[in-house]
């Protein structure tokens, strides 16, 4: 079977034909912030930002403010001439209005005679009284009046163009609300007083600025003078300002004048005291509230009372108590009372430190000793020193006479009953003893007897030596010398 293919073409029946939308204008291509203003035709920026494009046929408005000297930032079309003047739309409109007003002022209204002359052609004359000459002159006059037009006016000069009123508020585009009576030149009493007050305030501020400038110049010149004077003193010394020694007559005269000039500006006595008080008052008046607050703060005293008498000390900064009574303030946390010791309590205020229990310098606890001294060796009991009466002094050991000395094994002094070894100072170092004699002396029995003259004798060995006599201890005689006592 043959198949028949039928192609059905689509139709637009029953469908809504879409209405072509008008292409929306593109927005401005300003890069610093998004701008929703439409672009100018053939440009990429709006009228406000068209100056970003250097190739655009626009330039900055040529209007310059008379108040602050700033130029209008709006865009204006470039003129045909390179150095031509071009204004934005707002300033062009204001320029046209000002020019129109200027033309009205320069062209006064028609005078009465001119109006009567123009209306005389419509006046009716009496019948029969008009002559051909008069009718001919009347016709020529009407033709002359008809030929008279505004084109015969004088051209506008440069002086008649609008330059801008310095007192107007037309400098800013946003100044829409203007006072229509601002330039009237007629003021009420209140307005005159207000204007004069503003001018006086302005004049006062200018005087203050000028005074500050003069003060600055004075300080600068004084600083230079002191610097030059210091350099002069370092270079030449102070002899030129103290005495006329070594100076010529002319130099002495100049020195005298210099001293007079130095004393001329100085104040003495009551004048100096009054000048000082005046200077302090001026400082208090000029420094303002800060200086007054400082003086008020310095006059505050402590609020504590001791025996019903108020404390006369000045209070600490930002507090109402002095350093002695600061602990009475329950709100402060910078001071604590010293705990002292158990026997003697101490309530002296101490600044809070890193330690847990701050103490005053009198009750400060020292840390334990880090250095331990070395232990001293103890002396044995057998080597303890004997009584000082058993030893001879340096004066007693001086030899006065040469007497024989007898050595014995034992020394027995009658009266003391205490054995004492022989002193090595009584032996002659030139004496040499054999070993057996030393042993006999150390071990054998013997006695050393002291005679009445103070010499010692030895029993077994008869060795004669010179010795110093013992000092005799006893009662003093009349001449101050001790009386000798015999020792048997």
UniProtKB/Swiss-Prot annotation:
Keywords: Chromatin regulator, Isopeptide bond, Mitochondrion, Nucleus, Phosphoprotein, Ubl conjugation
Keyword Mitochondrion appears in the UniProt entry: yes
Region (Required for interaction with other NSL complex members): 308-364
Ranges of biased composition (kind: Basic and acidic residues): 135-144
InterPro entries: NSL2 (IPR026316), Potential_DNA-bd (IPR025927)
Chain positions with Phosphoserine modification: 147, 149, 168, 172, 175
Phosphothreonine carried by residues: 131
Chief location bin: nucleus
Cell location: Nucleus; Mitochondrion
Skewed-composition ranges (Acidic residues): 167-178
Disordered: annotated segments: 127-182
Any one cellular-component term (Gene Ontology): mitochondrion
Assembly with partners or alone: Component of the NSL complex at least composed of KAT8/MOF, KANSL1, KANSL2, KANSL3, MCRS1, PHF20, OGT1/OGT, WDR5 and HCFC1.
Described function: Non-catalytic component of the NSL histone acetyltransferase complex, a multiprotein complex that mediates histone H4 acetylation at 'Lys-5'- and 'Lys-8' (H4K5ac and H4K8ac) at transcription start sites and promotes transcription initiation. Required for NSL complex stability and for transcription of intraciliary transport genes in both ciliated and non-ciliated cells by regulating histone H4 acetylation at 'Lys-5'- and 'Lys-12' (H4K5ac and H4K12ac). This is necessary for cilium assembly in ciliated cells and for organization of the microtubule cytoskeleton in non-ciliated cells.
Cross-referenced PANTHER family: KAT8 REGULATORY NSL COMPLEX SUBUNIT 2
Name of the featured protein: KAT8 regulatory NSL complex subunit 2
Organism: Rattus norvegicus
Name of the gene: Kansl2
């Amino acid at each position: 079977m043959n198949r028949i293919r039928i192609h059905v073409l689509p139709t637009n029946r029953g469908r809504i034909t879409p209405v072509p939308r008008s292409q929306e204008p593109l927005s401005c291509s300003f890069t610093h912030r998004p701008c929703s203003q439409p672009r100018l035709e053939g440009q990429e920026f709006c009228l406000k930002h068209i100056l970003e494009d250097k190739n655009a046929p626009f330039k900055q408005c040529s209007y310059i403010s008379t108040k602050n000297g700033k130029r209008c930032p709006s865009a204006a079309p470039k003129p045909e001439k390179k150095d031509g003047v071009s204004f934005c739309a707002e300033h062009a409109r204001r320029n046209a209005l000002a020019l129109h007003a200027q033309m009205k002022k320069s062209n006064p209204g028609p005078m009465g005679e001119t109006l009567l002359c123009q209306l005389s052609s419509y006046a009716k004359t009496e019948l029969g009284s008009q002559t051909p000459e008069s009718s001919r002159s009347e016709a020529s006059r009407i033709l002359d009046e008809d030929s008279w037009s505004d084109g015969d006016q004088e051209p506008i000069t440069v002086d008649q163009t609008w330059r801008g009123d310095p007192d107007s508020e037309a400098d800013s585009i946003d100044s829409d609300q203007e006072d229509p009576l601002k330039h009237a030149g007629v003021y009420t009493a209140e307005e005159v007083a207000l204007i004069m007050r503003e001018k006086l305030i302005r004049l006062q501020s200018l005087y203050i600025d000028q005074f500050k400038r003069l003060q600055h110049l004075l300080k600068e010149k004084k600083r230079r003078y002191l610097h030059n004077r210091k350099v002069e003193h370092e270079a030449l010394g102070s002899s030129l300002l103290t005495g006329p020694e070594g100076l010529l007559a002319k130099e002495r005269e100049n020195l005298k004048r210099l001293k007079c000039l130095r004393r001329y500006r100085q104040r003495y006595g009551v004048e100096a005291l009054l000048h000082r008080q005046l200077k302090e008052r001026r400082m208090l008046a000029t420094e303002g509230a800060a200086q007054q607050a400082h003086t008020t703060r310095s006059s505050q005293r402590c609020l504590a009372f001791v025996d019903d008498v108020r404390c006369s000390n000045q209070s600490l900064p930002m507090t109402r108590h002095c350093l002695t009574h600061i602990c009475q303030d329950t709100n402060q946390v910078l001071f604590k009372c010293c705990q002292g010791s158990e026997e003697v309590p101490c309530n002296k205020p101490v600044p809070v430190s890193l330690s847990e229990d701050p103490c005053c310098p009198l009750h400060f606890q020292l840390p334990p000793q880090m250095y331990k001294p070395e232990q001293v060796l103890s002396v044995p009991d057998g080597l303890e020193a004997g009584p000082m009466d058993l030893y001879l002094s340096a004066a007693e050991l001086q030899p006065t006479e040469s007497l024989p000395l007898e050595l014995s094994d034992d020394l027995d002094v009658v009266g003391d009953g205490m054995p004492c070894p022989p002193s090595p100072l009584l032996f002659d170092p030139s004496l040499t003893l054999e070993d057996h004699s030393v042993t006999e002396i150390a071990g054998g029995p013997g006695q050393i007897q002291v005679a009445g003259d103070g010499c010692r004798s030895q029993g077994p060995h008869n060795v004669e030596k010179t010795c110093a006599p013992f000092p005799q201890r006893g009662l003093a005689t009349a001449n101050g010398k001790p009386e000798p006592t015999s020792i048997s």
